[in-house]
């Protein structure tokens, strides 16, 4: 009998167990999960709605040392395969702007269907057990957890990374992978908020506004994204900030000075802003600078933009000199923020970095160093952007690894 041990009961581990059990009905499949319940992170995804995947599924939406690795995995288990898999569980889905959610809009529905299938497939689940070591023996593997020994012919490492420790990912999987001979690219927080040094917008905390943000290393733009940015007391947040955060985190890890350029009027070029301001001034010749900006920006943001421009709030807009107008336009379009840190692993949605993908076969997720060992999900040096891409990665790698583990001769 093929004994398949899965370390980690998150998204990729659960799907790996189902795929393994479906592929080999005689296999003895079991999951070891250190939290009291499996699938805790699934419940937190998509603000509790579980953004399963995305219609615009492309390898360019993933980052890592080897971009081709993600492409090869997704060719085998992509958007269509994910929908088919969840349909086989009985899940109805819907699209919201290309983002795929359960029709119920509840992540709990997704987890419950996965748990129902685990029971149907007679997968044994051990919760509240922390894996301490993984050893190779003459007869396969031995997993040590809380003083117990779990022998296995195949092992799937689905432990997750270090992001959101409260949901079960504490980085312990990296040590297990290392013990099997694997190496890691630097692991840093990704899809995370950024902390700003000498934060000029701290008093505007709570403001949400459309903006384009760009990650800068010197004059080089590493990445940029547009959307709703949130100003916090310590820095900046929101989806566009999350999308560029991995580049900032990598730079900070390497000891580089990292900046973010913020454009508060992304829908207009600077020349268009200049023209719009002139037209606006013709209509409001008696407005103070505070009043002039009232119809353009959120109230709490206006004093901060004027402060950056060295302009008094009650100064008549009609009396501003050309150089002052340019300072104001620069503040609106090209504010530079120096980033001192990310908001850490505990607040990150995922990690950038992990087990180097060159050490894993992309068609099976099997280790090149240890026969019968498979690595999935966030443990690998692949992470996606916001929008269902990281769950897609978990489903895909979990399914391929589970199937391969069951079918391996």
From Swiss-Prot:
EC number(s) from the headed UniProt entry: 1.3.1.114
Keywords in alphabetical order: Bile acid catabolism, FAD, Flavoprotein, Lipid degradation, Lipid metabolism, NAD, Oxidoreductase, Steroid metabolism
Annotated positions binding FAD: 12, 33, 131, 378, 390-391
Top-level division of the source organism's lineage: Bacteria
Catalytic activity: 3-oxocholan-24-oyl-CoA + NAD(+) = 3-oxochol-4-en-24-oyl-CoA + NADH + H(+); 3-oxochol-4-en-24-oyl-CoA + NAD(+) = 3-oxochol-4,6-dien-24-oyl-CoA + NADH + H(+); 12alpha-hydroxy-3-oxocholan-24-oyl-CoA + NAD(+) = 12alpha-hydroxy-3-oxochol-4-en-24-oyl-CoA + NADH + H(+); 12alpha-hydroxy-3-oxochol-4-en-24-oyl-CoA + NAD(+) = 12alpha-hydroxy-3-oxochola-4,6-dien-24-oyl-CoA + NADH + H(+)
Pathway: Lipid metabolism; bile acid degradation
Annotated SUPFAM superfamilies: FAD/NAD(P)-binding domain, HI0933 insert domain-like
Cofactors, names only: FAD
Gene Ontology biological process terms, A to Z: bile acid catabolic process; lipid catabolic process
Any one Gene Ontology molecular-function term assigned to this protein's record: oxidoreductase activity
Purpose: Involved in the secondary bile acid metabolism. Catalyzes two subsequent reductions of the double bonds within the bile acid A/B rings of 3-oxochol-4,6-dien-24-oyl-CoA and 12alpha-hydroxy-3-oxochol-4,6-dien-24-oyl-CoA to yield 3-oxocholan-24-oyl-CoA and 12alpha-hydroxy-3-oxocholan-24-oyl-CoA, respectively.
UniProt record similarity statement: Belongs to the BaiN/RdsA family. BaiN subfamily.
Protein name stated in the entry: 3-dehydro-bile acid delta(4,6)-reductase
Organism in which the protein naturally occurs: Clostridium scindens (strain ATCC 35704 / DSM 5676 / VPI 13733 / 19)
Upper lineage: Bacteria, Bacillati, Bacillota, Clostridia, Lachnospirales
